[in-house]
């Protein structure tokens, strides 16, 4: 069974910067994501039959602090199908957040989970299937978009079936000085 662990990112389709971004890409047939913004922490291609991964997740997430991420870059990448993904990312990611993801990833692999992709911090904003528009053109357009950094505390974590129901959800604790 394909599953994934995600942390929700509290952005809104109607945010002014997102409206400006869509205008910036006017004339390009982007399918903009309208909700469910998140960062996939671990994508599990296959889970051993009968394996309950909630124990591993609780081990790591019960004491984890909510990361503060500053999204300060817009970029585009292509997936194996050739589709282009327009996304937000952060250039400075807290080491504690990266260590948490790596520990969860390692523990899941150690119990036999098949994980074929490495972690890549990004929040999908839109998808483009027009193969006539080349990646360098899209990247140049993304880089020319001027945006102010967006700092956010990320607290809501979901473990879900791929395109299915939530298996486990929790909230990471906030640091007391936030």
Label each PLM-derived region with a short phrase.
Residues 1-178:
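Histidine-dependent nucleotide/RNA phosphoesterase domain, centered on the 2H-phosphoesterase fold
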């Amino acid at each position: 069974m394909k599953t994934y662990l995600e942390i929700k990112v509290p952005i809104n389709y109607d945010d002014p910067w997102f409206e400006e971004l869509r205008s910036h890409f006017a004339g390009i047939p982007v399918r903009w994501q309208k909700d469910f913004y998140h960062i996939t922490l671990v994508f599990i291609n296959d889970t051993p039959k009968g394996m309950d991964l909630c124990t591993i997740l609780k081990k790591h997430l019960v004491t984890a602090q909510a990361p503060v991420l500053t999204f300060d870059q817009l970029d585009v990448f292509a997936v194996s199908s050739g589709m282009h993904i327009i996304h937000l990312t952060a250039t400075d990611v807290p080491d504690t957040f990266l260590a948490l993801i790596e520990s969860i990833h390692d523990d899941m692999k150690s119990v036999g989970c098949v994980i074929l992709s490495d972690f890549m911090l990004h929040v999908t904003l839109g998808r483009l299937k027009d193969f006539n528009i080349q990646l360098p053109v899209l990247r140049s357009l993304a880089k020319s978009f001027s945006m102010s950094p967006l700092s956010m505390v990320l607290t809501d974590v979901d473990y879900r079936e791929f395109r299915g129901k939530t298996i486990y959800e929790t909230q990471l604790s906030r640091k007391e000085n936030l």
